[in-house]
Amino acid sequence: IGGHSAGGHHAALLAVDDAWLKDIGTPRSVVRGCLPISAVFEFGAGSGLSMRPRFLGTDAASERRASPFSRLLAAPPPFLIAYGTRDFPHLIAQGARFAAALRKLGADVEELQLAERTHFTASYAGGESDGPWVPDALAFMAKHRG
């Protein structure tokens, strides 16, 4: 599973928190990998966000519930974490921290820095067959086909 920006955030949350899968009667084994691009992995203090997103509401506990970083499973699936080298600084930092946390739990993690891509142009890489993301994504998926 994967996505860009909010889509990458939701994919990562689904990959590391199996409660959503349980709610729909789906085994965790269906998620064989996660490929977020320019995703948010953490909300709240220390996240680097300059303001609280409206969708979190006013409940402080919602930051934790919405943060893949705070919902990591004991054995997370493989991840290919990508972001642009000119992406928002907090997303670059969060991607690196999240990758390190996943590795500590034994996950197979690859990081891909998309040269000269901003947050917005990083999304285009997902559709460029000869671009910087597609070949790595295909190799990642083949490796984790199961």
Q: Across the structure, where does each feature detected by a protein language model lie?
A:
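Mobile cap/lid helix-loop segments that gate and shape the active-site cleft of serine hydrolases
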Residues: V16, A39-R71, P77
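Primarily recognizes the serine-hydrolase "nucleophile elbow" in alpha/beta-hydrolase
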Residues: I1-L49
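Acidic catalytic loop of the alpha/beta-hydrolase fold
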Residues: F43, R86-H90
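Loop/turn elements at helix/coil->beta-strand transitions in domains of secreted/extracellular proteins
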Residues: V30-R32, P77-P78, A107
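C-terminal catalytic histidine-bearing segment of alpha/beta-hydrolase fold enzymes
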Residues: A82, I92-A99, R103-G146
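Short, conserved loop/helix-junction motifs that constitute active-site signature segments
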Residues: P27-S29, L72-A75
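Short beta-strand/loop motif that positions the catalytic acidic residue
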Residues: A75, I81-Y83
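Cell-envelope and extracellular/periplasmic
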Residues: A39, Y83-G84
